[in-house]
Design a protein with these regions (language model features):
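Hydrophobic alpha-helical transmembrane segments in multi-pass membrane proteins
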Residues: 1-96, 159-206, 294, 384-388, ...
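Core dinuclear metal-dependent hydrolase active-site scaffold
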Residues: 8-11, 27-38, 147-264, 296-373, ...
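Divalent metal-coordination and catalytic microenvironments
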Residues: 41, 80, 101, 138, ...
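Alpha-helical transmembrane segments of multi-pass integral membrane proteins
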Residues: 50-154, 396-401
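Metallo-beta-lactamase
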Residues: 262-273, 374-378
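Short internal beta-strands
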Residues: 266, 288-294, 397-402
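Active-site HxH/HxHxD metal-binding segment of metal-dependent hydrolases
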Residues: 270-307
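Cap/insert and terminal regions of metallo-dependent hydrolase folds
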Residues: 360-434
Length: 462
């Protein structure tokens, strides 16, 4: 759209004023597609063009072309930092080098060869094939070089999300630093930017825990946070299409919360809807310990088996495995994790255990089953949540990790009725999105459901 507006302006007025063209293109996009403001591409595209105009306006002076090119490239990376922070919580530190390499490579080598190959096509297919093949080889070399940059250990800078007002102050600082020197507000800009970097992510106090059931469709992914530690219980599904909930949901959530590593990942068992996203989490964050009910089946050498009775304490919060008792397979091998805050409130994560293990828990672990928060066993399947288990746990809140209109019909009506009979409040991720519960000393349980907190008409398409 911006190119079309620019060409029309040239035809109409000859030499259009750049900012007017930019403004007109912005107005046209918003007129044609108002919801484009919800997409990162809209903000990044218009911000990049605005930065180029700002960085090149009245700055030619005595600078050489090389100096102006460097100014624009590094200015773009610096200027787009606020938007990259807001949308992705990460910034590529190698982007200026990649752009300095790719732009002349493509502009002076690849594109001319492509055009020459196309022009030669009617006259000599042999020469055309050679030119087009050469351009393809040059693109392959460029791609290889960019891949080497991408795997550098210092390639990405990741940062937690910050509130809107702080990000606005940071953006103002960036703009002030990029203004022409005569108008520069560098001291104020540096002060604004440094203030944002000193912010610490919000964390629970010692003895408290924050529990997040992430919306990964028909699967399970839970994050448990204490004062100085974080545990991930299951990692959602991955699909043949390439979509991976670890990459799309879990890792971004952890990065947004300011974590650079996971203290412990628990993979309840080896089904895809519980393990599929784990590899993607490993790629983004360091995972210090891995435990599973089926360590051999998940295929990671450093994974150890979760066992009934194993317990530990993080920041005044007590963790204990209630099952598996023996070497089980499939759903019944699931790690059943009990988490107790300092004030005695309990979270129970049973994975996909079924009737037999529930009966065994009722017989052998009855006193420890009582919980305030329960993630329903096996997503609310009729093979789980037997009456004796439901009564033994007696939860105030039951959460069903299910996909919208899933093919299994979870949660099953008879299971829902059992929990309703004991007066439990029920939430499911299909209707509520991500669900967070905060167990904080001296406060009632705080329940935060994403869909209720973020009501927008364009998200109601169901």
């Amino acid at each position: 759209v911006m190119v079309c507006v620019w060409m029309l302006a040239i035809l109409w007025k000859g030499r259009p004023e750049p900012w007017r063209v930019w403004s007109l293109a912005l107005w046209m996009i918003l007129l044609l597609d108002p919801l484009s403001v919800l997409r990162a591409g809209f903000w990044l595209s218009f911000a990049a063009v605005a930065l180029i105009l700002l960085l090149t306006a009245g700055r030619s002076g005595r600078r050489s072309r090389r100096q102006r090119l460097l100014t624009v490239q590094f200015g773009l990376v610096f200027g787009l930092t606020p938007l990259l922070w807001v949308w992705f919580q990460q910034i590529s530190l190698s982007a200026p080098i990649a752009n300095l390499l790719a732009i002349p490579w493509v502009g002076f080598l690849v594109v001319p060869l492509l055009l020459a190959g196309i022009l030669c096509l009617p006259f000599s297919s042999l020469l055309s094939d050679w030119l087009l093949g050469l351009s393809a080889d040059l693109l392959s070399i460029l791609w290889w070089l960019l891949e080497q940059l991408a795997v550098l250990p210092v390639n990405l800078w990741q940062s937690p999300a910050v509130s809107g007002i702080w990000m606005l102050l940071f953006a103002l600082g960036v703009v002030g630093a990029l203004l022409p020197r005569a108008l520069s507000l560098m001291p104020v800009s540096l002060l604004l930017m440094s203030a944002v970097f000193r912010l610490e992510p919000e964390r629970p106090d010692s003895g408290e825990l924050w529990f997040s059931l992430l919306d990964v469709g028909q699967g399970l992914a839970v994050v448990v946070e204490t004062r100085h530690h974080v545990l991930v219980y299951d990692a959602g599904p991955a699909f043949r299409s390439g979509f991976n909930t670890g990459e799309a949901v879990i890792a971004p959530f952890l990065v947004q919360r300011g974590y650079r590593h996971v203290d412990r990942m628990v993979i309840s068992h080896s089904d895809n809807d519980h393990i599929g996203g784990a590899e993607a989490v490993f790629e983004r964050l360091d995972v210090l310990a891995i435990q599973s009910g089926e360590p051999g089946a998940i295929g990671w050498a450093r994974a150890t088996r979760c066992r009934s009775g194993h317990q530990w304490i993080w920041d005044g919060v007590h963790f204990e495995y209630l099952a598996p008792f023996d070497r089980e397979e499939g759903n019944n091998s699931s790690c059943v994790l009990r988490v107790e805050a300092a004030d005695g409130r309990v979270l129970l994560l049973p994975g996909d255990i079924e009737r037999r293990i529930e009966q065994q828990l009722v017989r052998q672990r009855y006193p420890q089953l009582a919980a305030d928060i329960l993630v329903a066993p096996h997503h609310g399947s009729r093979t789980s949540s037997i009456a004796e288990f439901v009564e033994a746990v007696g939860p105030d809140y039951v959460l069903f990790p299910v996909g919208y209109r899933n093919r299994f019909g979870f949660p099953r009506p008879e299971v829902v009725e059992r929990y309703r009979a004991i007066g439990a409040s029920m939430l499911d991720s299909a209707e509520s999105g991500a669900i967070q519960l905060r167990v904080e000393a001296g406060k009632p349980l705080q329940v935060l459901a994403y869909r209720q907190r973020s009501k927008r008409y364009w998200k109601a398409e169901r």
